[in-house]
Swiss-Prot record:
It comes from Thauera aromatica. One of its GO terms (molecular function) is DNA binding. The keyword Transcription applies. GO terms for biological process: response to stress. SMART domains: HTH_MARR (SM00347). This is Putative transcriptional regulatory protein for hcr operon. It comes from the Bacteria. Residues 1-155 form the HTH marR-type domain. Keywords: DNA-binding, Transcription, Transcription regulation. SUPFAM superfamilies: Winged helix' DNA-binding domain (SSF46785). InterPro entries: HTH_MarR-typ, MarR/SlyA-like, Tscrpt_reg_MarR-type_CS, WH-like_DNA-bd_sf, WH_DNA-bd_sf.
């Protein structure tokens, strides 16, 4: 059996049928996420070296000074054991510092560094432009409606922390 290398010919894709999943919301949510992340990678990751996940974590740390690593893991819906790797990356980039809690030596508190604050401000501007470009085919009202509907869906998930706010 020959392994497929590269992209298939456009003629192969012209006849592609997705079957019943073409009517499933989850399928379209995933396709939308892939498209958004692909554009983020082209515009933000290539220039700033930050993935959507790292950007999200920087936002949460910046808006919650002293947040513990465990709380960050819950807020980002990431396994606590894998959060250490990501925090290490952010610390190695000089964007955050990890301090031992004065009340519990087993707990680490996360804070932005001055260079991290500057980098986040620059990245936020780029993300705002990227987000506007990505949603350019939607009116402001449609964009607001879509965000509202998506929030309603993920807030019904029993594993989404109730105290996570925008």
């Amino acid at each position: 059996m020959r392994k497929h290398r590269g992209k298939p010919a456009n003629s192969d894709l012209a006849e592609l049928v997705h079957g019943s999943m073409a009517g499933e919301l989850g399928f379209h949510l995933r396709r939308g996420q892939i498209a958004a992340f692909r554009q983020f990678a082209r515009t933000i990751t290539t220039t700033e070296g930050v993935t959507p996940g790292l950007y999200g974590m920087l936002q949460v740390i910046a808006n919650n000074p002293g947040l513990s690593q465990s709380a960050l893991a819950v807020a980002m819906d990431v396994d606590r054991s894998s959060i250490v790797k990501v925090v290490n990356q952010l610390e190695e980039k000089g964007l955050i510092v990890r301090d031992t809690s004065p009340t519990d030596r087993r707990r680490y508190c996360l804070h932005m560094t001055p260079p991290g604050v500057q980098a986040l401000a620059r990245i936020e501007q780029a993300v705002m432009r990227q987000d506007q470009d990505f949603s350019a085919r939607l009116s402001d009202a449609e964009r607001g409606t879509l965000i509202g509907l998506l929030k309603r869906l993920y807030r019904q998930d029993s594993e989404t922390p109730a105290n996570v706010r925008e």
